[in-house]
């Protein structure tokens, strides 16, 4: 070994009691926070994605598919009006 930086080795860290006391609380907390973020619908609001029941409205039941090569801007305008 050429030199030491004075840092603890990874094996020392993960075998310490303090590591597991801290991480036994933080790791499950992250999973619970993520589950709440998605299950409450906050993820839809934050990222602006439509909720599962908002993909197709009563007036628009078809898929917004661009079919024309040269009139694509007009088709996009039609699709944006239906939102």
UniProtKB/Swiss-Prot annotation:
CC annotations in GO: chloroplast thylakoid membrane; photosystem II reaction center
Example GO molecular function: electron transfer activity
Coiled coil: none
Location of this chain's protein in the cell: Plastid, Chloroplast thylakoid membrane
Textual note on the cofactor: With its partner (PsbF) binds heme. PSII binds additional chlorophylls, carotenoids and specific lipids.
GO biological process, one term: photosynthetic electron transport chain
Chain sites annotated for binding heme: 23
Cofactor dependence: heme b
Major localization listed first in the record, in broad terms: plastid
InterPro entries in UniProt: PSII_cyt_b559_asu (IPR006217), PSII_cyt_b559_asu_sf (IPR037025), PSII_cyt_b559_CS (IPR006216), PSII_cyt_b559_N (IPR013081), PSII_cytb559_asu_lum (IPR013082)
Its membrane topology: Single-pass membrane protein
PROSITE patterns in UniProt: CYTOCHROME_B559
Domain of life according to the entry: Eukaryota
Membrane-crossing segments per the record: 21-35
Keywords: Chloroplast, Electron transport, Heme, Iron, Membrane, Metal-binding, Photosynthesis, Photosystem II, Plastid, Thylakoid, Transmembrane, Transmembrane helix, Transport
NCBIfam families given in the database record: cyt_b559_alpha (TIGR01332)
Function: This b-type cytochrome is tightly associated with the reaction center of photosystem II (PSII). PSII is a light-driven water:plastoquinone oxidoreductase that uses light energy to abstract electrons from H(2)O, generating O(2) and a proton gradient subsequently used for ATP formation. It consists of a core antenna complex that captures photons, and an electron transfer chain that converts photonic excitation into a charge separation.
Family statement: Belongs to the PsbE/PsbF family.
Oligomer status and interactors: Heterodimer of an alpha subunit and a beta subunit. PSII is composed of 1 copy each of membrane proteins PsbA, PsbB, PsbC, PsbD, PsbE, PsbF, PsbH, PsbI, PsbJ, PsbK, PsbL, PsbM, PsbT, PsbX, PsbY, PsbZ, Psb30/Ycf12, at least 3 peripheral proteins of the oxygen-evolving complex and a large number of cofactors. It forms dimeric complexes.
Protein name as it appears in the record: Cytochrome b559 subunit alpha
Organism: Mesembryanthemum crystallinum (Common ice plant)
